[in-house]
A protein has these predicted regions:
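Structural preference for beta-strand elements that scaffold enzyme active sites
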Residues: 18-20, 45-49, 68-74
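Non-cysteine beta-strand/loop elements that form the S-adenosyl-L-methionine
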Residues: 70-77, 96, 100-102
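Active-site beta-loop-alpha junctions enriched in small/polar residues
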Residues: 24-26, 51-53, 74-78, 105
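Active-site gating loops and adjacent loop-to-helix segments of metal-dependent hydrolytic enzymes
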Residues: 82-113
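Active-site mouth loops of central-metabolism enzymes
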Residues: 18-29, 108-113
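Short, Lys/Arg-enriched N-terminal segments with co-localized hydrophobic residues
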Residues: 3-16
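A short alpha/beta connector and helix-capping loop motif
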Residues: 30-55
């Protein structure tokens, strides 16, 4: 397992805490990707969550792939298109095959328990 860079250590001895900075939503848009890339390049971010189903996922990956970071899956069921066949998850997608928004999902859960 990759050792993450500690950005800040707070407290002393047994009561100390370490802060590791993580960025989420890599792949959401080119603007988000570039912001995360800048933070990774400057050493502020050492852990990144990637939205693999989003249109700009490949762009984001190409920006950060050569850095020594922890790159993880950001599970996403409320934006973009699913990686699986939308017909298999009809309660999660709209007619156009894209995921329902979090607001729509919340409404559906409220109505259907």
């Amino acid at each position: 397992m990759r050792k993450l860079k500690v950005i800040l250590k707070i407290g002393k001895g047994d009561k100390s805490m370490k802060l590791i900075m993580r960025a989420d939503d890599l792949g959401f848009s080119e603007a988000v990707n570039l912001g995360i890339y800048k933070a990774v390049k400057e050493g502020v971010i050492t852990s990144v969550g990637m939205m693999t189903n989003m249109e700009h996922a490949n762009h984001g990956y190409e920006l950060v792939k050569d850095f020594d970071i922890a790159l993880g899956q950001h599970t996403n069921i409320c934006a973009g298109r699913p990686l699986t066949d939308p017909k298999l998850i009809p309660s999660l997608v709209q007619e156009n095959g894209e995921f329902c928004s979090s607001r729509e999902l919340g409404k559906w859960i409220g109505e259907n328990g």
